[in-house]
Amino acid sequence: IKKFGNEVVITFYPQKRESKVFKEIIQWPTFGGGNSFVKRTLLEKVKFNMAFEFGYGEDADFGMQLRNQGVDILYLPNPEILHLKAPMGGFRTKPVLAWDKDSIQPKPSPTVQLYKILYLSPEQQKGYQMVLFFKYYSKQSFKNPLRYYLNYRKQWNQSVFWANQLKAKS
């Protein structure tokens, strides 16, 4: 942090047999909590949002809070710190989520949707919705486009509902 004059840095954090793609110091678009260094004074202005607990997005949300404070995140290719995977714990034990038993499963995950609601403009959210629609069309059992659209819309609305429930609790 001192050497580069930046308040937040992340380093290369490979798993076994993963090779380095970026070999230069660059401005990094995301934040990963597993191998980041943050100036202590910034930690008084941001926090982990518990609405993201057990889902995807807690690191990205934390990083957006930093970015909204005007902070840049630098990627440092060195030091290289090996990312070891624990044999148990973390996401290896699947938590029971409030929407797990819903007949219509939300798509995307409500925590992903929450991140989009918090940080994207309405136009960007619509764009994301459209990209996701086309991305999953070929992977669904519905080959009739209208039937797929109607089902997708239900799943999307379910995701928005649960994301707003999470948002209300945060």
Q: In which residue ranges do the predicted regions lie?
A:
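Short, well-ordered alpha-helical scaffold segment located
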Residues: T41-L43, E80
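Conserved donor NDP-sugar-binding/catalytic core segment of glycosyltransferases
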Residues: I1-K23
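Hydrophobic residues within well-ordered alpha-helices
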Residues: L66-R67
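Acidic donor-binding loop at a coil-to-helix junction in glycosyltransferase catalytic cores
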Residues: G55-F62
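Catalytic core of nucleotide-sugar-dependent glycosyltransferases
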Residues: F91-G127, K169
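Active-site donor/metal-binding and catalytic loop motifs
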Residues: L76-W99
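A recurrent flexible, glycine/aromatic-enriched loop bordering the glycosyltransferase active site
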Residues: V21-V38, L97-S103
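Non-catalytic, C-terminal membrane-associated alpha-helical segments of glycosyltransferases
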Residues: S121-S170
